[in-house]
């Protein structure tokens, strides 16, 4: 069973004296099959925008208490306060937030020239972070299906947070893995979503060329106390087995994979998603991925229940570097409908039409998009043979 944050056996808080941080072993957050909550997680009708109004799982309690302590200790580049938020008028339902500090104070992205670029130990990587930035290690119990030698995943604060609880999931940083999605990393990301009782805890991945700023394998996880359009957007099946769908009603259509929760279905989904991302990486196609609780594929409505986990994959134009003049840069959260805006002027003037235009500018040319879709459908078909 997952250990609560106030357990006598495990503490996820740093000792008061920072000279002791180096000597403190990284605590384990151990979880098993019964800690993965696939059903019964829904948005409250009365206060969907209030994080504190929802119950916490042991995972939520451990993450939030340890993250809050790091805020108090000043380990972030800036102190994240309540962000000004607006739902942009229109049909999409964009959630825009003003986050000036992240736009100004975040670490400059590394120079990336290829989606397949090798790991460079001389560049910044997660072996170079301060000891206090590590919250704990995710450790799966043997009762969970999947690879027997599943690597441990470090949960690390993002020192330039998008939102409350913004962390990075880093698989065994000493291995020096480049930013290429692997099954163990994806499994940890999906299971983190299932470990949380909050419907707004999301996980995502940016490839190189898809605005990953560090070429060292990591996923993002964070809380956003608002519904996003990807949770319930309708979709149409692309393969006879119904394993791959095309998400509709969004500025950038994405490939939708869906699972009801832990078990063989989840393992099959991980295999299919990684086959797709391997294809994209091998063909130098940048991509972004987003994991959220959501409705099943097909025709959905705003009232559709969040009965499982949606994994959405976008193939997109490569973008090597940050476009400083734009209201926002398009990566995993923007494609999902969450828009962290850099300046007050852009925040006050941003419209749905302008946001749609920025996102659509990252779409692949139609001929290449059709080629990618056909290739991914073929990959799904091969898997079923």
Swiss-Prot record:
Its main location: cytoplasm. It catalyses: GDP-alpha-D-glucose + phosphate = alpha-D-glucose 1-phosphate + GDP + H(+). Specific and highly efficient GDP-D-glucose phosphorylase regulating the levels of GDP-D-glucose in cells. This is GDP-D-glucose phosphorylase 1. One of its GO terms (cellular component) is cytoplasm. It is an enzyme of class 2 (transferase). The active site is at residue 218. PANTHER family: GDP-D-GLUCOSE PHOSPHORYLASE 1. It comes from Macaca fascicularis. The gene is GDPGP1.
């Amino acid at each position: 069973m997952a250990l609560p944050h106030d357990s006598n056996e495990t503490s996820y808080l740093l000792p008061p004296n920072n000279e002791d941080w180096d000597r403190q072993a990284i605590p384990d957050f151990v979880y098993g099959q019964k800690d993965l909550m696939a059903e019964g997680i829904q948005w409250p009708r009365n206060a969907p925008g209030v994080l504190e109004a929802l119950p916490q799982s042991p995972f939520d309690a451990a993450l939030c208490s340890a993250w809050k302590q790091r805020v108090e200790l000043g380990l972030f580049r800036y102190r994240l306060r309540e962000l000004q938020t607006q739902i942009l008028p229109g049909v999409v339902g964009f959630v825009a937030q003003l986050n000036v500090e992240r736009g100004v104070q975040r670490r400059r992205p590394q120079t990336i020239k290829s989606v397949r670029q090798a790991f460079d130990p001389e560049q910044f990587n997660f072996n170079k972070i301060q000891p206090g930035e590590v919250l704990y290690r995710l450790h799966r119990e043997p009762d969970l299906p999947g690879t027997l030698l599943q690597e441990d995943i470090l949960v690390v604060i993002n020192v330039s947070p998008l939102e409350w609880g913004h962390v990075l999931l880093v698989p065994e940083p000493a291995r020096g893995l480049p930013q290429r999605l692997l099954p163990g990393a994806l499994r940890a990301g999906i299971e983190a979503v299932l470990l949380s009782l909050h419907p707004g805890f999301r996980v995502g991945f940016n490839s190189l060329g898809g605005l990953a700023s560090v070429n060292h394998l990591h996923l993002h996880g964070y809380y956003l106390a608002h519904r996003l359009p990807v949770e319930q957007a309708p979709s149409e099946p692309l393969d006879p087995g119904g394993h791959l769908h095309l998400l509709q009603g969004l500025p950038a259509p994405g490939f939708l994979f869906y699972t009801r929760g832990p078990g063989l279905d989840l393992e099959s989904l991980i295999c299919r998603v990684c086959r797709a991302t391997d294809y994209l990486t091998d063909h130098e196609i940048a991509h972004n991925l987003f994991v959220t609780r959501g409705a099943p594929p097909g025709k959905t409505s705003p009232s559709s229940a969040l009965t499982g986990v949606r994994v959405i994959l976008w193939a997109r134009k490569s973008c090597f570097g940050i476009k400083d003049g734009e209201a926002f840069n398009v990566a995993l959260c923007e494609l999902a409908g969450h828009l962290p805006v850099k300046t007050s002027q852009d925040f006050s003037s941003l419209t749905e039409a302008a946001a749609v235009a920025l996102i659509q500018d990252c779409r692949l040319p139609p001929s290449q998009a059709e080629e990618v879709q056909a290739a991914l459908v073929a990959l799904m078909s091969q898997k079923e043979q």
